Amino acid sequence: MSRKESKAPRTRMTAGQTRVLMSFFKDNPFPSTTAREKLSKVLGVGPRTVQIWFQNQRQKARGQAKVSDREEGPRACTGSECLGKLCILACAAISRMEEEAAWNLGH
C-alpha cells in the first residue's frame, strides 16, 4: 500500500463547526480530553479531528504572534516566551477583546 492510499481524507469543517470551535478556542485554547470528546459529538467529527484542529489553531496563533512582534514590536511577551502556553492564552484574550470592541463600535 502506498503512502497516499493509507492517508485519511482531509476533513473540511463547515462554517458552523468552525464558529463553534473558534468560540471555544478563544475561551480555552487547551481543552481537556473530555471537552474535546464533547465537542466532537456536538460537531459530528472524530475526537482526533478536534484535537488536530486545536493543535493547528495554537500553531497559527504562535505564527501570528511572531509576525505581529516583527511588525509592531512585542505586545505581551518576547522571545521564546511567545511559544509558551501563557502567550497563546494572552493572544487569544487580546483577540477576543479586539473583536468585542469592533463589534461594539459597529452596533
From Swiss-Prot:
Keywords from the UniProt entry: DNA-binding, Homeobox, Nucleus
Subcellular location: Nucleus
SMART domains in alphabetical order: HOX
One GO term of the biological process aspect: cell differentiation
PROSITE patterns: HOMEOBOX_1, HOMEOBOX_2
GO cellular component term of the entry, any: nucleus
One Pfam family here: Homeodomain
Source organism, top-level taxon: Eukaryota
Main subcellular location: nucleus
Name recorded for this polypeptide: Homeobox protein HD-3
